[in-house]
Structure formats: C-alpha cells, structure tokens
Swiss-Prot record:
This is N-acetyl-gamma-glutamyl-phosphate reductase. One of its GO terms (molecular function) is N-acetyl-gamma-glutamyl-phosphate reductase activity. The keyword Cytoplasm applies. The active site is at C157. PROSITE patterns: ARGC. GO terms for biological process: L-arginine biosynthetic process. It comes from Bifidobacterium animalis subsp. lactis (strain AD011).
Length: 364
C-alpha cells in the first residue's frame, strides 16, 4: 500500500494527540513531522507518551516551511489560528482543519458566534451527513463531496453527535423545526487541554456536573443549524428555519458525548408507529458502517464507543407529549474529531472508509 506523508500541527493537544494515535497505526499514512508552539524543540513523547512509535519526533514551529512538502497536513489548532496559516500552504497537499475556521458557509453566522476574520468554507468532513433525498428516493450524502477533496473542514464534536441523532427526522420532515432542543453530556477533553477554572482541580471536577455556554451562546449552534438545513435538502441560507435550544453539560469523564435531542412530532409523524419511526433511522444509516442504530429500547452509552469512530444512535417517541427523542453516543476525540477527519481523508485518497479506524469501543 502506498504511504502518504503527514504533518500534524497542534500535535501536543488532545485533538492532535488523537489524530497521531490513529495515524501511528494507519497502513496508508506516515507521520513525518509534528508542530506546536510552546513545545518547540521537545520530543513528542514528552507530551504524547501513549504513542511510543512517534516519541522521538521533535516538535517544530508551526510554519508553512515545516508543514509543506507533505501529502497530508492536519491542523489541530484553536479557531482563528488555522485560517491564515492554511492560506499559505501548498495547494498540492490535502489539508484537514480540525478547528472551526472553515466549517461555516455564511459570514454572518461566523460573525455572530466567533468574530474575527472569516475564511472560505471547505469541503465538510462528515461523510454520513444527509444532503436531502434524491429523485430516486435515496439519501444524498456528503461522502460523495469528499472524493478527491484537497481542503477538508472537520466538524465540531457536539455538532457531530447532534446531527447524527436528528438528521433522519429532518430529512423526512417528521418534526417541527422550531421546537428542537439538544442537551449534551460532554467529557472534559471536549474543552481542550488549556487549564481552566472549571477543570483545573480534580477535587472540584470529579463528582460534579455543570452546564456551560448556555442561553444560545455555544459556537456549535450555527454549524448544527447549517447541517439541519442540508439534511432537509436546503442551502445554508435557510438555516434560520431551524430553531435550536442547545445546552452542553460538562460531566466527570475524560472523553465522550451523549446527546439527547428532542423535537415536537408533526401530526403526520404521530400517525406512524414506534416501529415505523425506528425503521426510518435504520434506513437512514443503512450502509454507513460507523453508525449503529441500536435495537429498540437499547440506549446508547459513551463507554461503548470510547476509542472508536463509531456512533451509537437510538430514537424513542413520547406519545403523551407528542415529542420525538433521539440519542447519540460518541467519543468526542475520535468520532467527534480525529477519527472522522481520518475517515474523510480515507475517502479523499480513494481508500476504504474504515482503513485504520475502529468501530469497537473499549469496555469496561
């Protein structure tokens, strides 16, 4: 198998570390350069000791001179840091941005939630994203857009969980799009590796749960609404059709997301049986090898997907309130970030989607 060289920027963080962990065992990719900021000149093993195969790589400065010359460049940088850098990179390289700089299609959405310079939207790296239903009655998917892509925007982790939970309902018109509520239990690694008051002391973090970015302020909201618009077969300009009350909650686990997403069912959808509604999810993810729709009544659990690129999905109906409840469990660093990015890279290079990726979680 041909080996493609890879440079990873942001190599000492959580997202960069997970990308390196997966790439270290990937049969088609070889990590030959790592870059950082405060870690320049140090061995990678000082920061990512769980990857002994790459321990002797020296962290270099995050510059085009270091990153160029590789077949693949992975940018695991905070939002606002990758946009200007990416504009200077070699056009021949395949670049995947794990940050937010190239996810949003509308500048107004960027200005409202991020601010600063707005950068060009890249090919969106969620292969299973539904883009409406074709004239043949089959789901159109983002996967086809990724074949041969040179610039890939990795989705947000919360975005991934929320989108995978509800997009079948959006595509089939089952719910009132002004009634969507998403509550997510999120592990601490989702907040990044920088020290914060909320996660600095184990004595305060463990055994405690706390919401954050409440009141419609979380930066993943416009991206989720953008995805819902696409699932309905609409453009990003129609994202305002979707109202989303979104609340993430930090819970005392190192990684993982459990998304609970609800919306009012339409009268037509209420006429369907629970089995018919469950079957819509089964059909929506048929052939999507990383998405597992669980048997009726079996609820997703973060423990069952840790370390994998899998997503476990379930749907239930509350007949008394006329509400649909959809659930997704993912590993935020793998399926939610690095694993999904490498799945997209596999597609871009014409490899099997699952090359170098696991569908099996770690238990206990």
């Amino acid at each position: 198998m041909t080996k493609y060289t890879v440079a990873v920027a942001g190599a000492t963080g959580y997202a960069g570390g997970e990308a390196l962990r997966i790439l270290a065992a990937h049969p088609a990719f070889e990590v030959t350069a790592v870059a950082g900021h405060s870690s320049i000149g140090h061995r990678l093993g000082e920061y990512q000791p769980h990857i002994p195969q790459l321990a002797d790589l020296i962290v270099e400065d995050t510059t085009p001179a270091v990153l160029d010359g590789h077949d693949v460049i992975v940018l695991a940088l905070p939002h606002g840091a990758s946009g200007a850098l990416a504009a200077q990179l070699d056009d021949d390289a395949v670049v995947v941005d794990l940050g937010a700089d190239h996810r949003l299609e509308r500048q107004q959405a960027w200005d409202d939630y991020y601010g600063g310079d707005f950068y060009q939207h890249w090919t969106y790296g969620m292969p299973e994203l539904i883009l409406g239903i074709g004239s043949d009655g089959k789901y159109v998917r983002q996967r086809d857009e990724l074949t041969g892509a040179k610039r890939i925007a990795g989705p947000g982790c919360n975005v991934t969980a929320t989108t995978l939970a509800l997009q079948p309902a959006i595509a089939q018109g089952l719910v009132d799009t002004k009634s969507i509520v998403a509550d997510l239990a999120v592990g601490y690694s989702g907040a990044g590796k920088n020290l914060k008051r909320t996660n600095l002391l184990a004595s305060e973090a463990m055994g405690s749960a706390s919401p954050y970015s409440v009141g419609g302020t979380h930066r993943h909201i416009p991206e989720i609404r953008q995805n819902f618009a696409h699932a309905a077969g609409l453009g990003a300009s129609q994202a305002d059709m979707f109202s989303l009350a979104f609340t993430p909650i930090l819970v005392p686990m190192s990684r993982g997301i459990l998304a609970s997403v609800s919306a009012k069912l339409t009268d037509e959808a209420l006429a369907l049986t629970d089995e018919q509604i469950h079957d819509i999810w089964v059909q929506a993810y048929e052939g999507q090898e990383f998405i597992f729709v669980l048997d009726p009544g079996v609820m997703p659990a973060t423990q069952n997907v840790l370390g994998s690129n899998a997503a476990h999905v379930q749907v239930a109906v509350d007949r008394r309130s006329g509400t649909l409840h959809a659930f997704t469990a993912i590993d935020n660093l793998n399926r939610g970030t690095a694993g999904q990015a490498i799945e997209s890279l596999n597609i871009a290079f014409g490899l099997n989607d699952a090359t170098g990726l696991s569908k099996i979680g770690v238990a206990p």
